[in-house]
């Protein structure tokens, strides 16, 4: 069973402000942001299926500013516009809009199809979705899923109870290069659900 969390789609824009320091940094920034976009879209394509069309990501402006280390005098819209230009050859023309402090990034069908065709589904995500969608599974099977993957990748898994934010059990890997996300897994009478956050987003909750 899947539920969408409003913070889930927050895009990490960290380092984007460094575009002013030269082309190399700008390209590096574009790749970092592009990866977060493609990871999020690919995840939702696998979770809910994809039969064409556009997909939208929503996030609050303060999260973008925090991730960018931008102060109130720096232009968030200009930074986003520069990024859109950089990724246009792959993701198509992104449509960005804002209502007050809530931003929407719409990825066109061209970009969504590119992501579906070019971005492989991570092994961990495949394994986790199988566990989550299998009736009767519990947190113990989730724990085994992360532990098995950690052993295969020669790292360790960290598990914490997120009582403060009521996000269930939080799983992450000691080596972030294995997987840079935090997985918040909840178990109730309806089964298992999860939300995936970047580490920065989770720490900011």
Descriptions of predicted regions:
Residues 147-183:
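A cross-family detector of function-defining hotspots
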Residues 177-205:
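Intrinsically disordered, low-complexity regulatory segments enriched in Ser/Thr/Pro
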Residues 28-56:
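Positively charged, polyanion-binding regions of nucleic-acid-associated proteins
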Residues 65-66, 71-94:
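Charge-enriched amphipathic alpha-helical scaffolds
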């Amino acid at each position: 069973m899947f539920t969408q969390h409003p913070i889930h789609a927050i895009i990490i824009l960290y380092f984007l402000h460094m575009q002013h320091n030269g082309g190399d940094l700008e390209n590096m920034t574009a790749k970092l942001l592009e990866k977060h976009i493609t990871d999020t879209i690919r995840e939702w394509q696998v979770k809910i299926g994809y039969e064409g069309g556009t997909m939208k990501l929503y996030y609050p402006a303060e999260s973008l500013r925090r991730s960018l280390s931008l102060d109130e005098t720096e232009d968030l819209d200009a930074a986003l516009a520069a990024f859109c230009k950089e990724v246009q050859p792959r993701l198509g023309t992104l449509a960005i809009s804002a209502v007050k402090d809530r931003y929407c990034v719409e990825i066109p069908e061209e970009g969504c199809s590119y992501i579906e065709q070019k971005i492989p589904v991570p092994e961990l995500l495949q394994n986790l979705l199988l566990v989550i969608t299998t009736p009767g599974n519990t947190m113990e099977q989730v724990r085994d899923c992360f532990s098995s993957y950690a052993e295969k990748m020669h790292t360790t898994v960290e598990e914490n109870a997120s009582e403060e934010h009521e996000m269930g059990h939080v799983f992450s890997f000691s080596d972030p290069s294995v997987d840079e996300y935090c997985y918040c897994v909840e178990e109730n009478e309806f089964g298992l659900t999860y939300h995936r956050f970047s580490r920065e987003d989770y720490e900011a909750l």
